[in-house]
UniProtKB/Swiss-Prot annotation:
Protein's organism: Rattus norvegicus
The gene coding this protein: Kcnn3
Regions of compositional bias (Basic and acidic residues) in chain numbering: 1-11
Keyword Ubl conjugation on entry: no
UniProt free text on domains: The coiled-coil domaim mediates heteromeic assembly.
Feature: compositional bias, Pro residues: 35-59
Family: Belongs to the potassium channel KCNN family. KCa2.3/KCNN3 subfamily.
Intramembrane residue stretches from the record: 495-515
Record protein name field: Small conductance calcium-activated potassium channel protein 3
């Protein structure tokens, strides 16, 4: 990039600088790029930047210096001219040749060596430019590219004002511009989640490089920040621009944001949405229970008032029935909303894309049955039918005109199943994340049955009491309503009489003084008897559990019994020893033997032996009873501790053995190197000995040369001078 704000591709072998360019380069790089060709080269060949000269000849150096001086003079003349103002940019634009464009990232990359190739550069991709690009952008001048003459190879690039973006990171620009020389392809980063917490604006530097045809230059389209499905600058081909614009305003704004929003939800958003659905489902269940119980209470009030105070055709009855119908409609809406939340939770938990996957036949049947149960209620208006029954003791038929509300009112008690649902959703075991995690690891399904089991374990008496009293009251009122049209003596139609009938049926007593007349009352008594048998069994189990000793009480009891049995064993053993001594005394030590006393002590001796055996047997039984599951678990813990200690000791032993092995290996290596050391030591001693002999021999030769005979040894040492086992070593 030169001082005029133009960009020169220096350092690339296929791009050359044109000496006729109106925008000269500056510095040493321009001098190296614009060196003239050698004299032998023809003028039509494009100038190539010469490589580094190694040890040039003096004439060549002089020629290069002259050429450089001429180039510097030309550059100074060109630099004295003003820079390209905005009017001149418009003139330069008319002289441009429209070439094939390369759709690139904001960083420049290597362009091919052709006269019709340019590249669009982002204004922030070259930060070292001296041209005021901001003024260029404010002037709204179109992007222009300048090419040299037919013989030139340089490409002067100007920034395009069509792209508007924030200032880029210089370190990012350096890393991206290195791809021009290293051949790397700039790929976009992976799209992050589109949730509200981690929405980030995508950078246009991450767009991949795409090559377009010379006849169809790219068109730059800038997306707004309000676009939910783009978030980044898109470069479209002009042939497909109209299709993208037309489709983006219609289908893109409706379908694409929803799909991307669903796909780009991260785990945190899903967990938060799941927790919100849990809370909404719990509130819907609470509201459904409230409206269901409200309808039951209003139904009971309307039934009792229409029997004694006013008739079914009165305004009070109509108002109460309308209130029941309104509560029923609200209840049905709440149930639909509840199951909608259930389906949404299923979709989130299983990662499904379509909610229809959750709508199995079983779920549809369950929802339909629940809607049918909750939809039953007395219809506003007066509707009657003839009810025929046979009396219990006289067996005479009885015919009466009854209200249809009896058939529609009694099934409303089936709405009480909502209590179990509310108990499940409000249970600590169901709402606590830790308990649910532990249950999932142990393959436990948290449902209503599990919650009822835990309640029966924690407070069995309270659960049975509440269940029995509720069943007693509901069954008594149902029998009273069923029997009121055929009870001429007012026995079972009385509420207290009905409670007595239900109580004796519940306890499976059945005195027979009161019996139902209608099939409705008989059916209620049958269900009451079945539920009473189950409740009685549960009561017996609860009482037996309450009478059972706890673990601490069992341990204390076993300890006390063991202590008493130990004392009895000691007493029985002492009695055996005492009777043995007395028998020995009366038979051996006394002069006159008293046979009566001997038989008496023998009898006591046998009794003491049997007593000792019996106490030992009781002690064995107590020890067997003490070996319960708790003791076995304790023994298991003790054995586990012992095994752990043994493992620790074995690990220590292995470490010691390993250290011994390493030491043995070291000793083995030392022993293996010992012969070499001994050989080296002996060799050194032999050399020292030979040196001493040579020195001694030299001294003796110097003293008596004429007296010593000539030596045949190659080193001039006589064999007699070496010590032998049979000679003296005084010469040493």
């Amino acid at each position: 990039m030169d001082t005029s704000g133009h960009f020169h591709d220096s350092g690339v072998g296929d791009l050359d600088e044109d000496p006729k360019c109106p925008c000269p380069s500056s510095g040493d790089e321009q001098q190296q790029q614009q060196q003239p060709p050698p004299p032998s080269a023809p003028p039509a060949v494009p100038q190539q930047p010469p490589g580094p000269l190694l040890q040039p000849q003096p004439p060549q150096l002089q020629q290069q210096q002259q050429q450089q001086q001429q180039q510097q003079q030309q550059q100074q003349q060109q630099q004295q001219a003003p820079l390209h103002p905005l009017p001149q940019l418009a003139q330069l634009q008319s002289q441009l040749v429209h070439p094939g464009l390369l759709h690139s990232s904001p960083t420049a990359f290597r362009a091919p060596n052709s006269a019709n190739s340019t590249a669009i550069l982002h204004p922030s991709s070259r930060q070292g430019s001296q041209l005021n690009l901001n003024d260029h952008l404010l002037g709204h001048s179109p992007s222009s590219t300048a090419t040299s003459g037919p013989g030139g190879g340089s490409r002067h690039r100007q920034a395009s004002p069509l792209v508007h973006r924030r200032d880029s990171n210089p370190f990012t620009e350096i890393a991206m511009s290195s791809c021009k020389y290293s051949g790397g392809v700039m790929k976009p980063l992976s799209r992050l989640s589109a949730s509200r917490r981690n929405l980030i604006e995508a950078e246009p530097e991450g767009q991949p490089l795409q090559l377009f045809s010379p006849s169809n230059p790219p068109e730059i389209i800038i997306s707004s920040r309000e676009d939910n499905h783009a978030h980044q600058t898109l470069l479209h081909h002009p042939n497909a621009t109209h299709n993208h614009q037309h489709a983006g305003t219609t289908a893109g704004s409706t379908t694409f944001p929803k799909a991307n929003k669903r796909k780009n939800q991260n785990i945190g958003y899903k967990l938060g949405h799941r927790r919100a659905l849990f809370e909404k489902r719990k509130r819907l269940s609470d509201y459904a229970l409230i409206f269901g119980m409200f309808g039951i209470v209003v139904m009971v009030i309307e039934t009792e008032l229409s029997w004694g105070l006013y008739s079914k055709d009165s305004m009070f009855s109509l108002a109460l029935k309308c209130l029941i119908s309104l509560s029923t409609i609200i209840l049905l809406g709440l149930i639909i909303a509840y199951h909608t939340r259930e389906v949404q939770l299923f979709v989130i938990d299983n990662g499904a894309d379509d909610w229809r996957i959750a709508m199995t036949y079983e779920r549809i049947l369950y929802i339909s049955l629940e809607m049918l149960v909750c939809a039953i209620h007395p219809i506003p208006g007066e509707y009657k039918f003839f009810w025929t029954a046979r009396l219990a003791f006289s067996y005479t038929p009885s015919r009466a005109e009854a209200d249809v509300d009896i058939i529609l009112s009694i099934p409303m008690f089936l709405r009480l199943y909502l209590i179990a649902r509310v108990m499940l959703l409000h249970s600590k075991l169901f709402t606590d994340a830790s308990s649910r995690s532990i249950g999932a690891l142990n393959k436990i399904n948290f449902n209503t049955r599990f919650v009822m089991k835990t309640l029966m374990t924690i407070c069995p008496g309270t659960v049975l009491l509440v269940f029995s009293i509720s069943l007693w009251i509901i069954a008594a009122w149902t029998v009273r309503v069923c029997e009121r049209y055929h009870d001429q003596q007012d026995v079972t139609s009385n509420f207290l009489g009905a409670m007595w009938l239900i109580s004796i049926t519940f306890l499976s007593i059945g005195y027979g003084d009161m019996v139902p007349h209608t099939y409705c009352g008989k059916g209620v008594c049958l269900l009451t008897g079945i539920m009473g048998a189950g409740c009685t069994a549960l009561v017996v189990a609860v009482v037996a559990r309450k009478l059972e000793l706890t673990k601490a009480e069992k341990h204390v009891h076993n300890f006390m019994m063991d202590t008493q049995l130990t004392k009895r064993i000691k007493n029985a053993a002492a009695n055996v020893l005492r009777e043995t001594w007395l028998i020995y005394k009366h038979t051996k030590l006394l002069k006159k033997i008293d046979h009566a006393k001997v038989r008496k002590h023998q009898r006591k001796f046998l009794q003491a032996i049997h007593q000792l055996r019996g106490v030992k047997m009781e002690q064995r039984k107590l020890s067997d009873q003490a070996n319960t599951l708790v003791d076995l678990s304790k023994m298991q813990n003790v054995m586990y501790d012992l095994i752990t200690e043994l493992n620790d000791r074995s690990e220590d032993l292995e470490k010691q053995i390993g250290s011994l092995e390493s030491k043995l290996e070291h000793l083995t290596a030392s022993f293996n190197s010992l012969p070499l050391l001994i050989a080296d030591t002996l060799r050194q001693q032999q050399q020292q000995l030979l040196t001493a002999f040579v020195e001694a021999r030299g001294i003796s030769v110097a003293v008596g040369t004429s007296h010593a005979p000539p030596s045949d040894s190659p080193i001039g040492i006589s064999s007699t001078s070496f010590p032998t086992p049979y000679t003296s070593s005084s010469s040493c």
